[in-house]
Amino acid sequence: MNAAFIAALFILGALTLDAMAYSPTCEGKPCANNTDCKGSNLCQCRPPRGDDWRNFCSEY
Protein backbone atom coordinates (compact mmCIF):
# COMPACT_ATOMS: atom_id res chain seq x y z
CA MET A 1 0.00 0.00 0.00
CA ASN A 2 2.74 2.46 0.91
CA ALA A 3 4.73 1.63 -2.23
CA ALA A 4 1.67 2.23 -4.42
CA PHE A 5 1.01 5.55 -2.70
CA ILE A 6 4.62 6.67 -3.10
CA ALA A 7 4.60 5.59 -6.76
CA ALA A 8 1.39 7.56 -7.35
CA LEU A 9 2.93 10.67 -5.78
CA PHE A 10 6.06 10.24 -7.86
CA ILE A 11 4.03 9.95 -11.08
CA LEU A 12 1.89 12.94 -10.13
CA GLY A 13 5.00 14.98 -9.36
CA ALA A 14 6.60 14.01 -12.66
CA LEU A 15 3.47 15.02 -14.56
CA THR A 16 3.30 18.31 -12.69
CA LEU A 17 6.94 19.12 -13.41
CA ASP A 18 6.42 18.20 -17.05
CA ALA A 19 3.45 20.54 -17.25
CA MET A 20 5.43 23.32 -15.58
CA ALA A 21 8.43 22.91 -17.86
CA TYR A 22 6.67 24.91 -20.58
CA SER A 23 6.81 28.52 -19.49
CA PRO A 24 4.65 30.60 -21.81
CA THR A 25 6.81 33.63 -22.58
CA CYS A 26 4.51 34.72 -25.36
CA GLU A 27 0.94 33.69 -24.67
CA GLY A 28 -1.65 36.23 -23.61
CA LYS A 29 0.49 39.30 -23.08
CA PRO A 30 -1.04 42.58 -24.28
CA CYS A 31 0.73 44.22 -27.23
CA ALA A 32 0.55 47.07 -29.72
CA ASN A 33 2.77 45.52 -32.41
CA ASN A 34 5.06 42.53 -33.01
CA THR A 35 8.05 44.14 -31.28
CA ASP A 36 6.14 43.99 -27.97
CA CYS A 37 5.98 40.19 -28.22
CA LYS A 38 9.08 38.46 -26.90
CA GLY A 39 9.86 34.81 -27.43
CA SER A 40 10.13 32.65 -30.51
CA ASN A 41 9.77 33.89 -34.08
CA LEU A 42 6.21 32.53 -34.10
CA CYS A 43 5.16 34.96 -31.37
CA GLN A 44 3.15 37.73 -33.01
CA CYS A 45 0.74 40.44 -31.97
CA ARG A 46 -2.77 39.17 -32.80
CA PRO A 47 -6.03 41.11 -33.13
CA PRO A 48 -8.59 40.90 -30.34
CA ARG A 49 -11.07 38.04 -30.28
CA GLY A 50 -14.38 37.60 -28.57
CA ASP A 51 -15.37 40.46 -26.30
CA ASP A 52 -11.78 41.43 -25.45
CA TRP A 53 -10.77 44.73 -27.07
CA ARG A 54 -6.98 44.39 -26.61
CA ASN A 55 -4.39 42.90 -28.96
CA PHE A 56 -2.47 39.98 -27.48
CA CYS A 57 0.70 37.99 -28.15
CA SER A 58 0.25 34.46 -29.39
CA GLU A 59 2.26 31.79 -31.19
CA TYR A 60 -0.81 30.45 -33.01
From Swiss-Prot:
Contains 3 disulfide bonds. Belongs to the ixodegrin family. Keywords: Disulfide bond, Hemostasis impairing toxin, Platelet aggregation inhibiting toxin, Secreted, Signal, Toxin. GO terms for cellular component: extracellular region. Expressed in salivary glands. Tick salivary platelet aggregation inhibitor that plays an important part in the anti-hemostatic strategy of ticks. Inhibits platelet aggregation induced by ADP, thrombin and thromboxane A2 (TXA2). Blocks platelet adhesion to soluble collagen (most probably through the binding to alpha-2/beta-1 integrin (ITGA2/ITGB1)) and binds to purified glycoprotein IIb/IIIa (ITGA2B/ITGB3) in a dose-dependent manner. In vivo, reduces thrombus weight effectively in a rat arteriovenous shunt model and inhibits thrombosis in a carrageenan-induced mouse tail thrombosis model. The keyword Nucleus does not apply. It is found in: Secreted. Its main location: secreted. This is Ixodegrin-Ip. A motif (Cell attachment site) lies at residues 49-51. GO terms for molecular function: toxin activity. Residues 1-21 form the signal peptide. It comes from Ixodes pacificus. The keyword Hydrolase does not apply.
